[in-house]
Amino acid sequence: MSKKLQQISVPLISVILGILLGAIVMWIFGYDAIWGYEELFYTAFGSVRGIGEIFRAMGPLVLIALGFAVASRAGFFNVGLPGQALAGWVMSGWFALSFPDLPRPLMILATIVIALVAGGIVGAIPGILRAYLGSSEVIVTIMMNYIVLYVGNAFIHSFPKEIMQSTDSSIRVSANATYQTPWLAELTGNSRMNIGIFFAIIAVAVIWFMLKKTTLGFEIRAVGLNPNASEYAGISAKRTIILSMIISGALAGLGGVVEGLGTFQNVYVQGSSLAVGFNGMAVSLLASNSPVGILFAAFLFSVLQVGAPGMNAAQVPSELVSIVTASIIFFVSVHYIIERFVKPRKQLKGGK
């Protein structure tokens, strides 16, 4: 099996196994798995609104997954995406609520820049610690998730009462600040599809070009493969790691503001780290950190997310719906194990 075919087959096997495991669990508990999946796909694709919701869910997933991919290419396992996304959401939300009368083009541009900066700063901290102190990026980024979560919640509680709907939730941002637009809502049956999907598509093209066609992209890939050899070749591994984490965090921050101002249109206290951050990691892993592949992986995850409530029509309880989704994520997480058993033939012959 060629390397290219392997890169395609491994994610496909992961998805098929996840769907099969979900079906087996449903059958064990006496539910009709075929009916359940029919309802899932009907809910996702059976209406224009459902399709709009798929594209709505894709926006933040693609952006956050791209952030994970950039860090991974540099050899950095960025578990801090939920915190970086939340930083972008909270800071941009605060700005939008504080200056509601800002003209829409300027407001959108300002919230994008603020999200990029906030996410980039949160991403830079573990990058600096890894580059100069050799700290474990996994531990540091996990701790950063908690720091951003609780600092963000405290910051929201300090908002002026005029912009708060309740103790834990702000009012909606103004029409100038929301990423939803009337023409997209009308086009997609009043779904929450927003301009975030366009940001995501542009980001895919930019990140693909950066990784494949620029000096920085070459340096990121070189450091990810062998930082010591990169240093010997004149590439600063420390600088590259920090830059990759700034870019990774910035993309996650942009994903966060797309989720916040595109889906919810407000800011509120979070009980735990953003699930969309971890889902973005799974999307990138499923796509083997390929920018183009991330689009397709995010589409699959969005279909599952939008279609899952429809499985209740097949009398499948919500707990089993969650198991189906978790099964996909599980096999995505272990697809590297599958990859070990689907090696290219040339590698197998070399091993002999």
Regions found by a protein language model. Name each.
Residues 1-17, 23-27, 225, 232, ...:
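Cytosolic-side transmembrane-helix boundaries in multi-pass membrane proteins
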Residues 25-29, 35, 45-99, 112, ...:
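Single transmembrane alpha-helix segments in multi-pass membrane proteins
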Residues 31-35, 72-89, 131-140, 219, ...:
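Short, non-helical or kinked segments that cap or interrupt transmembrane helices
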Residues 58-69, 84, 90, 120-124, ...:
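Hydrophobic alpha-helical segments embedded in the membrane of multi-pass proteins
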Residues 137-139, 166, 194-199, 271, ...:
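Loop-to-transmembrane alpha-helix initiation sites
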Residues 141, 145-211, 350-351:
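Transmembrane helix-bundle core of multi-pass membrane transporters
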Residues 188-266, 291-292:
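Helix-loop-helix "hairpin" substructures at the membrane interface of multi-pass membrane proteins
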Residues 246-252, 256-326:
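Transmembrane alpha-helical segments in multi-pass inner-membrane proteins
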